[in-house]
Amino acid sequence: YMKTESKPGMAPKLLDIVESLPSKVGIYYIHNEKGDLIYIGKSKNIKNRINQHFTSKVSKSIKIQKQVYTVTYEETGSELIALLKESEEIKINKPIYNRAQRKTLFNWALYSEKNKDGYIALKVAKTDGRKKEITSFASLQEGKNALFRITEKYNLCQKVNGIYDTKKSCFQYDISQCFGACIGKENPEEYNKRVHDFIQNNSFENNNMVLIDKGRTNGERSAILIENGVYKGYCFYDLNYQISNIEVMKNILIPMQNNRDTRTIIQGYLRKN
């Protein structure tokens, strides 16, 4: 058992709250004296995260330190469930200090379009509701980093995807990771097949998926259900109790809302795992 380091001057009330929290993955709820929710967050380590809120000198944290009365929490075991739950709880409860997160945060998206030479180019642009997006991002930099990894993973061309500005062949071609779309050497049909593979692997549309992850204890697993491309919810199950089919899972499912944010959170998770 490790006592949390407290900075000099942390009020005993705050210290007591920190000491009562687990060093586990989950979502936490900060309440004021009236019982109103003033902030919701998620963390890989709830205890550490609350300790940061209570010792930080930024103005939002100082307001939280003055107003906090209790902190409740829910362990999720899975980081993905914590992210999804945080997103939904903020939308429903609209806590005063979560203002920024109430709005949809993903303002950049990945789009595909055929270029003049017949190759399908992928590009990151400001979100445009009229166009069909493949996935979305919180920042332009996150989008560019993802596009870079996608281009590498699927042997696509940096020049076609607008990452490498050149009149000649792209850098990936010089090290044999691109098959020459940049200089018209690879036939567009072959190239576009790999782009379609990427889109297929990253699109939920009509897909049925069960994402299995860690549970809250060693003997437990968590599962997230996506049915026909729609995020349905999550559940926890005992390792000794096999979930043999989707119907069994649906009986213990905690239903959740499906929206653009949940789709983006799940896609981001799939990209990284």
Map each language-model feature to its residues:
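Acidic, glycine-enriched active-site microenvironments
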Residues: 1-273
